[in-house]
């Protein structure tokens, strides 16, 4: 796995492009803080997107049922695996680290059609 630091000047473009490639992914958000320890904010929820708002100086991680805001982000690191981005780590102005882990949503098998041929007779 390779890790890359993303320069702040590229955050908006990087997250816009990343969000387009994350359709169908699920995310887990962990907040690591010296004061509070490690807390899981969200567990494998459908990911809508990640965006950087330069005007308000925040990163928004939008999940199906949660909007997670990171105020005053200072550093962004991305972990790349074989299939692309597997995690994003963001350090905020208070020294907390927010880790977004990504995975593909589970694919369910197609419904069985065993009984459908009998009902059409």
What are these regions (language model features)?
Residues 36-46:
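Short coil-to-beta-strand transition motifs
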Residues 72-121:
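Helix-rich interaction surfaces within compact, conserved domain-sized segments
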Residues 44-92:
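Acidic, aromatic-enriched beta-alpha/helix-loop junctions
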Residues 32-34, 64:
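A structural micro-motif recognizing beta-strand termini
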Residues 2-23:
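N-terminal leader/targeting segments and the immediate start of mature chains
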Residues 23-32:
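A short, Trp-centered hydrophobic/proline-enriched beta-strand micro-motif
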């Amino acid at each position: 796995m390779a890790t890359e630091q993303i320069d702040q000047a590229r955050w908006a473009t990087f997250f816009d492009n990343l969000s387009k490639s994350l359709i169908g992914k699920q995310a887990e958000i962990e907040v690591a803080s010296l004061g509070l320890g490690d807390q899981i904010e969200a567990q494998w929820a459908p990911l809508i997107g990640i965006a950087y708002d330069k005007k308000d100086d925040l990163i928004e991680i939008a999940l199906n049922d949660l909007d997670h805001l990171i105020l005053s982000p200072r550093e962004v690191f991305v972990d790349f695996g074989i299939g692309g981005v597997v995690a994003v780590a963001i350090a905020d102005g208070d020294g907390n680290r927010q880790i977004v882990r990504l995975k593909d949503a589970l694919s369910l098998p197609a419904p069985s059609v065993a009984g459908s041929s009998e009902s059409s007779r």
